[in-house]
Structures are given as structure tokens and as C-alpha cells.
Amino acid sequence: ELRLPEIARPVPEVLPARLPLPALPRNKMAKNQ
């Protein structure tokens, strides 16, 4: 059971890794404004 919470942590870490990709275009648009 202790291993379950440990596996749940790496999952959220992978999601944020994909967020930076869409966040880049937003930062570029902000600079254009």
C-alpha cells in the first residue's frame, strides 16, 4: 500500500512536464502584446 502513494507522485510530475509546452506559446503572445 505504501508503494501506491509513491507511484501517484510521479504521475502528477509527468503532467506538468507537458504543460510547459502549451505555456510557451502563451508567453510569446504576452511578449507580442
Curated annotation (Swiss-Prot):
Annotated effect of mutating A23W: In [A8W,A17W,A23W]RP-27; important decrease of stimulation of insulin release, increase of TNF-alpha and IL-1beta production effect on mouse peritoneal cells, and no change of IL-10 production effect
GO biological process: defense response
Keywords per UniProt: Amphibian defense peptide, Pharmaceutical, Secreted
Entry GO terms, CC: extracellular region
Variant or mutagenesis effect after changing A17W: In [A8W,A17W]RP-27; important decrease of stimulation of insulin release, increase of TNF-alpha and IL-1beta production effect on mouse peritoneal cells, and non-significant decrease of IL-10 production effect
Source organism, top-level taxon: Eukaryota
Keyword rRNA processing in record: no
Subcellular location: Secreted
Claim: Secreted is one of the keywords in the record: yes
Tissues expressing this chain: Expressed by the skin glands.
More details: RP-33 is present in skin secretions in higher concentration than RP-27. RP-33 may be a precursor of RP-27 that is activated in the skin in response to an appropriate stimulus.
Name of this chain's protein: Rhinophrynin-33
Species name: Rhinophrynus dorsalis (Mexican burrowing toad)
